[in-house]
Amino acid sequence: MAATLRELRGRIRSAGSIKKITKAQELIATSRIGRAQARLDSARPYAFQITAMLTTLAAEAALDHPLLVERPEPKRAGVLVVSSDRGLCGAYNASIFRRAEELFSLLREQGKTPVLYSVGRKALNYYTFRNWDISGSWTGFSEQPQYENAAEIAETLVESFMRGTGGEDEGESDAESVDELHIVYTEFKSMLSQSAVAHRIAPMVVEYVEEPPEVRTLYSFEPDATTLFESLLPRYLTTRVYAALLESAASELASRQRAMKSATDNADDLIKALTLMANRERQAQITQEISEIVGGANALADAR
């Protein structure tokens, strides 16, 4: 009985220690999520406008650029998987990997070989353990990504894409080249809602928007459409990657805050249950000791 009581008290202390850790992680995530949301809200309008501008520019000027043209018989598709550097964020990474696997299966059905790029230590460890060849990986900034991080990633992806040869024989193709670029990340909708999504970022999908004749917009390009497009294109790709990193950072913190709050609440419930069990055990122990004392006293009285 004494051993059981000691075990219960030890479990209570362990649960209390874990609760302190989870509560601290919850408070840290809560304090950071506001800044992450503010950065995301600031970046979204710019990402939307530059995408709309390039789409309009490509449609109006009928540009023929490698990042706009679908390649015949594409064979290799680059996929950037954005995960977290740390755990303790619930099903955040599992959802990303599941969505990435769905994309890999779809690409293989289309006759394309996935070429993997990863952001975050969790993705690096996950795919390394499964013997994937990782063409590029970046770690250390999943919670607080900077524009420079996105620029470095975008530069690597664009270099691989521009080396792509499309329909040539696979043996003649550059081992580092890709014909498409996709990105898998977690889209932040609210503190309670995030979802893993996959988008193709190259070749760009040019959408032609029909305007009524009375509001038809006339565009003038200075110095010319091609030069303007060439200068904006690197910013577009970097912005798309940066927006995905910010979406993922906000989603990671929101997932961690929820997971740690749930863990803290569970620790509270466990401590209450263990405390009740310990109190009952202690009460039974005291009752037994009293019974033994009374029994001993009665035995002495009878002996007289």
UniProtKB/Swiss-Prot annotation:
CDD domains assigned to the protein according to its UniProt record, in alphabetical order: F1-ATPase_gamma
Coiled coil: none
Pfam families named in the record: ATP-synt (PF00231)
GO cellular component: plasma membrane; proton-transporting ATP synthase complex
Role played: Produces ATP from ADP in the presence of a proton gradient across the membrane. The gamma chain is believed to be important in regulating ATPase activity and the flow of protons through the CF(0) complex.
Subunit field text: F-type ATPases have 2 components, CF(1) - the catalytic core - and CF(0) - the membrane proton channel. CF(1) has five subunits: alpha(3), beta(3), gamma(1), delta(1), epsilon(1). CF(0) has three main subunits: a, b and c.
Name used for this protein in its record: ATP synthase gamma chain
Organism of derivation: Mycolicibacterium paratuberculosis (strain ATCC BAA-968 / K-10) (Mycobacterium paratuberculosis)
Taxonomic lineage: Bacteria, Bacillati, Actinomycetota, Actinomycetes, Mycobacteriales
